[in-house]
Amino acid sequence: MTKMCCAGLAGCVLFLAVALPAASEPARYEADVCVYGGTASGVMAGVAAARAGRSVVIAEPSRWLGGMVGGGLRVSIDCKYPRDIGGLTKMMLEEDDRIGGESPHERQQAFRDLFRRLADTHGLQVLYEHRLGSVETAGGRLVSITLDYAPPGIDGCPAAKATGPAAARIRARVFIDASYEGDLMAGAGVPWCVGRESAAAYNESLAGVRNLRSFDLDPYVRPGDPSSGLLPMIDPEPVGPAGSASRHTMAYNFRLQFVGPGEGRPVPAPSEEYAARYALVRRALETNRAFVGWPNGNYNRQSVISGGIPGRQSGYAEADWRERSAIWREWSEHVRIMHALTGSTQTLKPGEYPDSEDFPPQLYIRLARRMLGAYVMTQHDLAYETRIDDPVGLGFYFVDIYPCRLVVVDGKVATEGETNELVSPGPYPIAYRSLTPKREDCRNLLVPVCLSASHVALSSMRMEPTYMILGESAGIAAVRAIEEEAAVQDIDLPRYLAALKEAGQVLHWDGTSYDDFRRGWLKWKTKQDQPAETVEPET
């Protein structure tokens, strides 16, 4: 029986497919491979499949390709150990070097142009401003997806609702969910999770609630009076014991770029709608008892609050588009309010985002859903405590978890969750099985971004170069599944690994020194562990 699944909801409701009236029939597309999400990973997946002669359609909710690469990041910024990066990602690193620039954050427009050229050169059909509406499955396979036309705002904020009835339907033999949110995966009925597992779930020492950083700042509406309630932005839930599970994942933010007064576009004045929520920031600034790291391009880890709205990210992954739009808008307002409260005179750097009023069009969604797939990558895989026989590429970054929320500890405000630990002796292999659902859940879907991993493991693998590597490997796997007429779980592994090597992917660490990266990480970590007042805001 064919079933349709309404996507974009917290739950998934199955119902029988019904014929639409002729007047509302969506445009129809057919391809060998459908990629949902034109992130950097999604483009790499599409290019890999197209290079093998397969037709590809990419559905992208925004007006741009590349996601965070071109939306605030460059390929090289989180690529501290490039020698073990190959394939298309290596090519992109070389392009990054050619693009040049004085800062690892600038020239964002050049990367958006680069991704568009890649799509054009390889004949990828891209449906911009189209997002998932519903999913059709039959016999354990995805059959088609129906897309809604929902143009985002000029600044990239998702539309609260689509402009009308279903706009497009894509049928494909293999689907790849390369979105940051994992909407196609969820819509297909594949199990997934959000938040942080407990330390006991996978026996991970870095998992769960941990690392409280306390500030000499009163959390109550009336200082010293718990009965007056907590200030906005402070999580009222109990902190929980160390290592316990939490629904909160790491903070999101925009990767902003500023220049001096008069050199760029002024940051717009904030609205009054959210002003009352910032009493905590006002108190920190007025009492000078907690570091407020603004302006900066990141989430300053010593700051009580900076680029991220504490805890607000935790509802994003499971929200519908109306709620996501509201959350995204709150982040835009957060930038304006923080700029106004701190009295910053810096301006938005011109030329980086000329078609979104110099404001980044992509919210940095560090983690959202995580698939519960055929294999779950964990801290033990990063530490080489397991054996991976189906590697699709190498991860290399440390476990990097930004503060997750604000809590109360002993009557003071504290951040919770920040973790930065290098547990890997060297670049570690990522299992192909972590890109595939369990066979009984879906047989023609690959997931290179919201892959099957614990919160700890994905906190290392979440870097854009790694996502790009996984995207290319997913594209090659899709080709193998089509050519072998097999489920993605059943492709011939030796032939697949040979295809990855032929594409230039690096599958094994050669054991040579990781010391340069380790020394750099230790230097960075030492700086992060200094008292907040002695650390300059990140730029």
Where are these regions (language model features)?
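Boundary at the C-terminal end of the N-terminal hydrophobic targeting segment
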Residues: 21-26
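Beta1/beta-strand and adjacent pyrophosphate-binding region of the FAD-binding site
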Residues: 28-39
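N-terminal Rossmann-fold NAD(P) dinucleotide-binding loop
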Residues: 42
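Flavin (FAD/FMN)-binding glycine-rich loop and adjacent Rossmann-like elements that form
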Residues: 151-174, 178-537
